[in-house]
Amino acid sequence: MAMNTVFLHLSEEAIKRLNKLRGWRKVSRSAILREAVEQYLERQQFPVRKAKGGRQRDEAVGVEELCKQHKE
């Protein structure tokens, strides 16, 4: 999977906590942040208008479904 670079501004406290976690888990900060973002996106639901039986209704869908619908 291709990776892109993202720049974040974090508080000193967040960096300290991230560094402690990095040392404890023996993985890079990037790996921890990537995992956190992926978990966050998995939990998110987005309301999308979908046609069902000739009428529109709101339906919550996950990120993957939203991206799939956007491509169609």
UniProtKB/Swiss-Prot annotation:
Domain of life, source organism: Bacteria
Biased segments, Basic and acidic residues type: 55-72
InterPro entries on file: Arc_rbn_hlx_hlx, CopG
GO molecular function, one term: sequence-specific DNA binding
Gene Ontology biological process terms in this record: regulation of DNA-templated transcription
CDD domains: RHH_CopG_NikR-like (cd21631)
A Pfam short name: RHH_1
Stretches for region Disordered: 52-72
Protein family membership: Belongs to the YiiE family.
This protein's name: Uncharacterized protein YiiE
The organism's taxonomic lineage, starting at the top: Bacteria, Pseudomonadati, Pseudomonadota, Gammaproteobacteria, Enterobacterales
The encoding gene: yiiE
